[in-house]
Amino acid sequence: MIGMIITATISVALIMVLLVLAGTFTWVERRLLGFVQERYGPNRVGPFGSLQWVADTVKILTKEDRPPPGADKLLYILAPAVAATPVLAGFGVVAIGDGWALSSVDVGLLFLLGMLGLTAYAAVLGAWASNNRFSLLGGMRAAAQMLAYEVFLGLSLMGVVMIAGSFSMAEIVEAQRGVWFVVLQPLGMALFTIAGIAAAHRLPFDLPESENDLIAGFITEYTGMSFGLFFLGEYLAVLLVSALAVTLFFGGWLGPWLPGPVWFGLKTAVIAVAFVWIRATLPRPRYDQLLSFAWKVALPLSLLNLMLTGIVVVARSAS
């Protein structure tokens, strides 16, 4: 009983920390975008606008939130929760230090990939429930995009699994004590980065909610806290993909002098900022180009990477 209470307390604390980190990340992103676009960005609420996300949260909480006419109310309300909850659950298996994980399971990587994949259901549910043609188009795009990119997202990580010999996040990190896997798996890292951006629906792969041609895609009819939960899920997904990249390719918590969790946080912050930089600099492709790249280029490359890694692993074990 006491153990359950402790676990529940730690879980609630972790969720609160993640919510604060997601809010802070929105401010960091807006400041960086302002810098790239030669403008100030948020600078009114708090030092350098650092509390702007708090003001935005209050604004969202006080806005009216009701389904549009003709909407499926149950699915309309359920979709935003599906957008944020699986991502929060995914952080439960992320180890930020030696023994610093809410749940250490042998198949942590598979669990995390499954949680990332569930976010596509939120887009489809929200699109269908909204009774809006633009929302429906955005939901169809989200489903097709996730189907295409989830395949080579998993395949791009199988090289790491083959080298480490485990799906456990902690064991994968420990296997990088000699050399980080980004050195051994540069192609896998590049493919994972592309797939991770697509899985999080981030620019330049935000086609399911493309403002230029779909108004706001599957979130067109959402307002208030329902919109906020979709927004929260997107930014948490970026942080989760960044943490996963650090764990699988950049040595996780390994590093000299500083404590492991500090190293993990610094590395994750660098990767997250890199995602913002990609958003600020790269144009959005056409939707057919996005899917063609996934099936005709990325998938064959991920299979090639898997085959070459298998040959090397077998050759090393034989010698």
From Swiss-Prot:
What topology does the record note for this protein and the membrane? Multi-pass membrane protein
Question: What are its E.C. numbers?
Answer: 7.1.1.-
Per the record, the domain of life is Bacteria
Q: Which sequence ranges are marked TM in the entry?
A: 1-21, 77-97, 107-127, 147-167, 179-199, 214-234, 238-258, 262-282, 293-313
Which UniProt key words apply to this protein?
Cell inner membrane, Cell membrane, Membrane, NAD, Quinone, Translocase, Transmembrane, Transmembrane helix, Ubiquinone
Q: Which GO terms describe its cellular component?
A: plasma membrane
Cite a single GO BP annotation: aerobic respiration
Which enzyme type, at the first EC level?
translocase
**Disulphide bridges:** none
User: InterPro entries from the xrefs?
Assistant: NADH_UbQ_OxRdtase_su1/FPO (IPR001694), NADH_UbQ_OxRdtase_su1_CS (IPR018086)
- Catalyses which reaction? a quinone + NADH + 5 H(+)(in) = a quinol + NAD(+) + 4 H(+)(out)
**Pfam families per the record?**
NADHdh
Where, subcellularly, is it found?
Cell inner membrane
Q: Does the keyword Transmembrane apply?
A: yes
Whether DNA-binding counts among this entry's keywords is: no
List the GO molecular function terms. Answer: NADH dehydrogenase activity; oxidoreductase activity, acting on NAD(P)H, quinone or similar compound as acceptor; quinone binding
The UniProt family comment states: Belongs to the complex I subunit 1 family.
This chain's function reads:
NDH-1 shuttles electrons from NADH, via FMN and iron-sulfur (Fe-S) centers, to quinones in the respiratory chain. The immediate electron acceptor for the enzyme in this species is believed to be ubiquinone. Couples the redox reaction to proton translocation (for every two electrons transferred, four hydrogen ions are translocated across the cytoplasmic membrane), and thus conserves the redox energy in a proton gradient. This subunit may bind ubiquinone.
Describe the protein's quaternary organization and the partners it interacts with. Answer: NDH-1 is composed of 14 different subunits. Subunits NuoA, H, J, K, L, M, N constitute the membrane sector of the complex.
Protein name from the UniProt record: NADH-quinone oxidoreductase subunit H 2
Q: Which organism is it from?
A: Rhodopseudomonas palustris (strain ATCC BAA-98 / CGA009)
Q: What is the lineage of its organism?
A: Bacteria, Pseudomonadati, Pseudomonadota, Alphaproteobacteria, Hyphomicrobiales
